[in-house]
Amino acid sequence: MLDFLAENNLCGQAILRIVSCGNAIIAELLRLSEFIPAVFRLKDRADQQKYGDIIFDFSYFKGPELWESKLDAKPELQDLDEEFRENNIEIVTRFYLAFQSVHKYIVDLNRYLDDLNEGVYIQQTLETVLLNEDGKQLLCEALYLYGVMLLVIDQKIEGEVRERMLVSYYRYSAARSSADSNMDDICKLLRSTGYSSQPGARRPPNYPESYFQRVPINESFISMVIGRLRSDDIYNQVSAYPLPEHRSTALANQAAMLYVILYFEPSILHTHQAKMREIVDKYFPDNWVISIYMGITVNLVDAWEPYKAAKTALNNTLDLSNVREQASRYATVSERVHAQVQQFLKEGYLREEMVLDNIPKLLNCLRDCNVAIRWLMLHTADSACDPNNKRLRQIKDQILTDSRYNPRILFQLLLDTAQFEFILKEMFKQMLSEKQTKWEHYKKEGSERMTELADVFSGVKPLTRVEKNENLQAWFREISKQILSLNYDDSTAAGRKTVQLIQALEEVQEFHQLESNLQVCQFLADTRKFLHQMIRTINIKEEVLITMQIVGDLSFAWQLIDSFTSIMQESIRVNPSMVTKLRATFLKLASALDLPLLRINQANSPDLLSVSQYYSGELVSYVRKVLQIIPESMFTSLLKIIKLQTHDIIEVPTRLDKDKLRDYAQLGPRYEVAKLTHAISIFTEGILMMKTTLVGIIKVDPKQLLEDGIRKELVKRVAFALHRGLIFNPRAKPSELMPKLKELGATMDGFHRSFEYIQDYVNIYGLKIWQEEVSRIINYNVEQECNNFLRTKIQDWQSMYQSTHIPIPKFTPVDESVTFIGRLCREILRITDPKMTCHIDQLNTWYDMKTHQEVTSSRLFSEIQTTLGTFGLNGLDRLLCFMIVKELQNFLSMFQKIILRDRTVQDTLKTLMNAVSPLKSIVANSNKIYFSAIAKTQKIWTAYLEAIMKVGQMQILRQQIANELNYSCRFDSKHLAAALENLNKALLADIEAHYQDPSLPYPKEDNTLLYEITAYLEAAGIHNPLNKIYITTKRLPYFPIVNFLFLIAQLPKLQYNKNLGMVCRKPTDPVDWPPLVLGLLTLLKQFHSRYTEQFLALIGQFICSTVEQCTSQKIPEIPADVVGALLFLEDYARYTKLPRRVAEAHVPNFIFDEFRTVL
């Protein structure tokens, strides 16, 4: 019969593909369960209030039109819904595809069963497939994996969350319009079961059997599979466990399959007492906690509670005397085998000869160890015992008492067993690889010895007192030929013949009285030894490795091992060299990957890589978690070193008097520093002792592991310091900003210095790591803060700054800001608020408007540079850009609302436009016209002023940041600054040349050069924030005249001061001049330049018309408003770096010259 798994056997390949797919689906479900967006859980009140109206469960399907009409009625809900869609459609689609795969899996399995019944596969029926060993395994696995999928989904992705995700996918995707979509079937299969994985939650009635029956499956198939699992050893595991007391361990995988599949036929669990008794007697006579798939544990006492037959059958196993007997037995076994293993692990004990002579004994010891570890780990696990279940608690307490359970001793047994297993495996692999070479070597040596003896008896080779003997000569030559004729490939015949040759050599020694000659005896003894070695070597079989692999399976502990993490870490803390022993345990755990990958590999599925990566990644993450104790301990020592160096040890001056030497010696503190440094070195040594290890398919390099661990610990501590150090009290007078920055600066300097100190002792690039990680923390926090202003947010798994191995921690927000960078920015904005402070441009300083006390100055930004570095200032700058964009967008919507939708304001503006046209003319009776328009539009200026001043305030801050960045760049990196400036000038020259002559080259759209150079220029402060275009705009009617009117409406609130320029007239009606000018300038910059032209022309017309009206007075005097307007034009030209002639185009130059002399 054709091999069932052969590539040309369609029947076998079809079911193999289904099973392979099943394993891949479970891996995907487990992977996705870690990425459920928190918002779908609707746990906290804020999420419920915000998203409650747009996230629906299956009640939505009762009347979708009703729900959608509610959404359509509220534009803000529509907007939120659209934003939610943009942010979550990618992850929701991924979940939907996983759910769809589960449904497709069972549809494919049902179709395969139908094909078998209909005879699609020639000469194959359900019965014949179940008779085949591989076919039987695959059919059982196919149904079992479907059950596991359903259980995993319910455990890892709550029913309500599934429903919300499916409804969201239905609403946001094209699935609803697709005719061939099986959305309905998927929803029916995965609707909420009412099950909750929370401890203490009640189990829903008829769960999980009603869930398992949502898609009908061929009943005779289920029945036959259960029959096979009840009667057969489908994986032939019993041969690896010959002892009867190990029978339940041998059949553990089959027992897990049977446990899951019985839910497809719950009548057996309920009423078939005989069958259940048979199942319990065969599979669960001495165990009741089982692992069903990759460490998912189930306690049968709890799981079978609702089923009468199952519960009754299990009572014998759970009889207190049986529980006591099992616990005591495993306690005794574990003590006995632990002593044996420790003996085996003694240096020099496991030699090749010893191993080859004692294979059965060593394998028995391994079996006992692994069986004891399995039973004790499963039956003492907290995850398998619901603390609210009294019976479970009693059984567990009984086990803990009778087995004298001590987690440390059990862990030590696991550690030693893993080490023992690892050494044995490595020895066997080595011996197998050298098997033929060694065998041939022994054969050659034995044959040569016989030839030499033949030569001795020929009389050719003189040997003391050996007489010539032609018979012996011929006999030894024959033996030599016989040895040479042994064939390695025919090991059975060779083994038999070797034994005969050994006997012949023993007999020849006795019959021919050869004992009298010691040299001849030695030759015979050597040859017999070589022949013995040949027998030993030929008996090295791969079956031993396979048995060790089966026996050493640790997949049941895939999750349970986590309960030993604290013990592992404590052991490492006490003795860092423990890491080398742990390596064997991690490798033993890696063998669990064989379970899900076997079928995927057999099917040559492309899923092999992603599934391997998932499980290997999970294991590597666990290894990192355990070994993280080393960087943690190093940092604890490091903090003590920092404290000693900063507070206790006095820095030695360059010149020192001899008599003061004792004062500076400080032997005590210096000895303490040396001791702590030595401890750090020991920890480093400990982790580096672990060789480069292949965990699954991921190579773990201990040096990289150490560096990543140090980075992780650094990130954790620095992120916490930044979070805690930048929390402000908005009511504090004066502001806490500068003291907190200084304090945080000292903390950051301490970290920086300690990192410099440690780098040589742990062989890392301290400064490089420091800069990379601090920049990552700041950039990530800026990104999170900017998410507030983005419609499509950057999720953690999309962020280029977030990492799974070295995660940046997230902290609960303490105010409206999400992160420390937001709090810092808002605190700066609060203390430099233009309504409260006055910015003096020449001094770069802010003063309180009422008390005239200094509030802050440009020193603030050098302090931020010292504390947070260039990354901090640059991040602050980026955040201000987002805030300006938001403010400008708000301004545009406000403009639409208060001006373009207000008939009265529009009529006033039309009248004014008519009165001032053409712009080059002088407006007659100007005062009356202007101030009448201002009076009619008075109500709109408050909101307008606030928006303009906010933008202006942020632009001033951006200028200050650019100055500080540019100064520090020129000071610290003059070559970088020069290179950037030259490259910038060269690029601008090339672009200008292209516009003069379009045949010259120009960077294309797909060329990232301009974007990349912009990032560098902004980081080096080589840019002008006032020239930046923040938003795209459309044409706005009345825009220039509204801005002009706004400006002249503000001028009466200001007065000119010779020393300070324009200042606020009354603190009760606050207006700050620099933010006002810069805010208007920035606003106009966002629109076409003709708007600016019109705006300047209107100011020029206002100045000329007002001056014209003044000259008719007896004593002509320049009005204050004209002075303000002239100063605005001057400042406008200065800030935009435009020549004065731009202003003179609208105002005669003699007025400009005159007004300065009059002031």
UniProtKB/Swiss-Prot annotation:
Which InterPro entries does the record associate with it? WASH_strumpellin
Q: Pfam families, per this entry?
A: Strumpellin
Task: Recite the UniProt keywords alphabetically.
Answer: Cytoplasm, Endoplasmic reticulum, Endosome, Phosphoprotein, Protein transport, Transport
In the record, Phosphoserine modifications are located at S917
Give the UniProt entry's GO cellular component terms: cytosol; early endosome; endoplasmic reticulum; WASH complex
Keyword Protein transport found: yes
The places in or outside the cell where this protein is found are: Cytoplasm, Cytosol; Endoplasmic reticulum; Early endosome
Gene Ontology BP annotations? actin filament polymerization; endosome fission; endosome organization; protein transport; regulation of actin nucleation
Tell me the domain of life: Eukaryota
Keyword match Plastid? no
Complex formation? Component of the WASH core complex also described as WASH regulatory complex (SHRC) composed of WASH (WASHC1, WASH2P or WASH3P), WASHC2 (WASHC2A or WASHC2C), WASHC3, WASHC4 and WASHC5. The WASH core complex associates via WASHC2 with the F-actin-capping protein dimer (formed by CAPZA1, CAPZA2 or CAPZA3 and CAPZB) in a transient or substoichiometric manner which was initially described as WASH complex. Interacts with VCP, PI4K2A.
Family in the record: Belongs to the strumpellin family.
PANTHER family the record matches:
WASH COMPLEX SUBUNIT 5
Q: What does this protein do?
A: Acts as a component of the WASH core complex that functions as a nucleation-promoting factor (NPF) at the surface of endosomes, where it recruits and activates the Arp2/3 complex to induce actin polymerization, playing a key role in the fission of tubules that serve as transport intermediates during endosome sorting. May be involved in axonal outgrowth. Involved in cellular localization of ADRB2. Involved in cellular trafficking of BLOC-1 complex cargos such as ATP7A and VAMP7.
Name of the featured protein: WASH complex subunit 5
- Gene name per UniProt: WASHC5
